[in-house]
Amino acid sequence: MQGSVTEFLKPHLVDIEQISSTHAKVILEPLERGFGHTLGNALRRILLSSMPGCAVTEVEIEGVLHEYSSKEGVQEDILEVLLNLKGLAVKVQNKDDVFLTLNKSGIGPVVAGDITHDGDVEIVNPEHVICHLTDENASISMRIRVQRGRGYVPASARAHSQDEERPIGRLLVDACYSPVDRIAYNVEAARVEQRTDLDKLVIELETNGTLDPEEAIRRAATILAEQLDAFVDLRDVRQPEVKEEKPEFDPILLRPVDDLELTVRSANCLKAETIHYIGDLVQRTEVELLKTPNLGKKSLTEIKDVLASRGLSLGMRLDNWPPASIAED
């Protein structure tokens, strides 16, 4: 049914082709022209860079001090062993950081299934080869650290963020946390009734087995939707800065002149001139005060000294005096 020319077509899931447990193809149509690439590229970038997962981050191998070495009885050099450990597909429940152990002796391959772990850990690819022992008396023992993270974090980036006193023999591994091994999308032509200018989005995805391909796409779409939520209700969500209101006058100016503890003679002279607050007093000049009956130079000097001890002086100019609180009194 033809809708309004301004109404966008809403895509629906057409088909999910499960090629294998780790490989699937998802087809979505119809999409308005151009939206195939818009959505496909956004989902592709999220699937490659932002999917959480678990990866080997550190390894300690008995008898090995650094990665640029070899171990007697082991066919591969240590760099190749570390590279093989990067291919370990691990699922960890309820934990973000676990340690696994591997002890193997005797001639033959050392595989992921030889790793010892607890019930919270699942090795998805137990047949994955880590190295080969070439002698009946050869053995290898290692402690493997697996952490949860997102995207790809090279060992060099983590080395700078960790303590410089990292023990000799603790080897850092480039961590590829993403469970997505490969993602590709293709945009094909689609048709709805008489419209032939529509898009069909085909996403082909492979994972390492720790996450179902369909679930991976679902999570990527959720991440994208959550990031776009801020644009749906577009407004400045920053908290406004609360400016501290400064009092219009120094609180000391609002205090009565009695708080100055002047002599009785000086205090009575000020009251006779209706000078009740310190703010009233500081606005008077020396000449004005000397005109006050019974207030001589001795009292004037006393008043000046008391005001100076409080950082005040005579002849001050106070705009908007008296404040409303005093005027009401």
From Swiss-Prot:
Location of region: Alpha C-terminal domain (alpha-CTD): 249-329
Keywords of the record: DNA-directed RNA polymerase, Nucleotidyltransferase, Transcription, Transferase
GO molecular function, one term: DNA-directed RNA polymerase activity
Keyword Nucleotidyltransferase carried by entry: yes
One example of a Gene Ontology biological process annotation: DNA-templated transcription
Organism superkingdom: Bacteria
Recorded family membership: Belongs to the RNA polymerase alpha chain family.
Role according to the record: DNA-dependent RNA polymerase catalyzes the transcription of DNA into RNA using the four ribonucleoside triphosphates as substrates.
NCBIfam families, A to Z: PRK05182.1-2, PRK05182.2-5, rpoA
Protein name per Swiss-Prot or TrEMBL: DNA-directed RNA polymerase subunit alpha
Lineage: Bacteria, Pseudomonadati, Pseudomonadota, Gammaproteobacteria, Pasteurellales
Gene: rpoA
